[in-house]
Amino acid sequence: MSIRVGIVGISGFGGGEAMRLIAGHPAFEPVYAAGEGSAGQRLSERFPGVPAKLADLVIEKWDPSRLPQLDVLFASLPTGASRDALARIPREVKIVDIGGDHRYADGWTYGLADVWPEAIAGKTRIANPGCFPAAALTALAPLLADRLIAPENIVIDAKTGISGAGRGGGAGFGYAESNENLIPYGLLKHVHMPEIESTIARISGGSAAGLVFTPHLVPMTRGILATIYARGRATSDQCLDAARSFYAGRAFVRVTDKPPQTKWATGSNLAFVSYAADPDRNLVIALGVVDNLGKGAAGQAVQNANLMCGLPETAGLEGAPVWP
């Protein structure tokens, strides 16, 4: 039985990555695609490498009142563009919002799939985590759950590829400006700070007061490395053991005793975490790596949709990362 799937926001990087993954999914059948920047084009015009069976699917202008019969809808729209529109979709259509409009909304479940998979199964409205929270929280969750670190005064220093700025980019993100350059942005006010703070508090049962989060754009296409500093008396081995126990049986989180690299996750839904600790200095360093378009966006969205539909969560996501 095929599950009829639609994608809104296919013109952007997140929507395009969702289409790439869904095109090879064993149960999902893409029957609808919408994108403001590519309406009227055949899918093969926008994505020349799309499988032949999808080549003639025409990208439509997004209109929530004119959807075909769907089982699942992936929405990859800019912040502020989806709240009213998605409220018009019938409840029987399962929705995964890859954008940021529903992460705190009533009636929506936060889809941090490797931490709370049981909360996602059977739901019809899932808010996908942001890309930076996906990297940072995957690394922090085991330590917070086991009380190995304090939830207060955590410092997150994160690096992301230029695709993290979106396909629209903007001033300062062109090749000449981003090549051989390192660009900090969103200091003290990044949109992902409240999401990280609230989830730290939820996992720890405490407060995330004093969180510092500074993201940087680096001259690579995709990938996130979050280097996180926290207070705690645990050893490195205790942190690694906690993560291995926490993620036992989880298909997509790899715990490594070597510092992870962004290349390890490229093109996949994998997350890599590692830890180094100095109890004498009351210091724990946690490292989290994801592909910002994979686990940080479309990959986790497909994982969430699998859980919603009662499918194996690995369906359509078992491909190895791209190397080199």
Curated annotation (Swiss-Prot):
Gene Ontology terms: biological process: L-arginine biosynthetic process
Name of the encoding gene: argC
GO cellular component: cytoplasm
Reaction it catalyzes: N-acetyl-L-glutamate 5-semialdehyde + phosphate + NADP(+) = N-acetyl-L-glutamyl 5-phosphate + NADPH + H(+)
Cell compartment(s), UniProt: Cytoplasm
Keyword field contains Cytoplasm: yes
Function (record text): Catalyzes the NADPH-dependent reduction of N-acetyl-5-glutamyl phosphate to yield N-acetyl-L-glutamate 5-semialdehyde.
InterPro entries tied to this protein: AGPR_type-1, NAD(P)-bd_dom_sf, NAGSA_dehydrogenase, Semialdehyde_DH_NAD-bd
Name the UniProt record assigns to this protein: N-acetyl-gamma-glutamyl-phosphate reductase
UniProt family annotation: Belongs to the NAGSA dehydrogenase family. Type 1 subfamily.
Active-site residues, record numbering mapped to chain: C131
An example molecular function term from Gene Ontology annotations: N-acetyl-gamma-glutamyl-phosphate reductase activity
EC number in record: 1.2.1.38
Record keywords, A-Z: Amino-acid biosynthesis, Arginine biosynthesis, Cytoplasm, NADP, Oxidoreductase
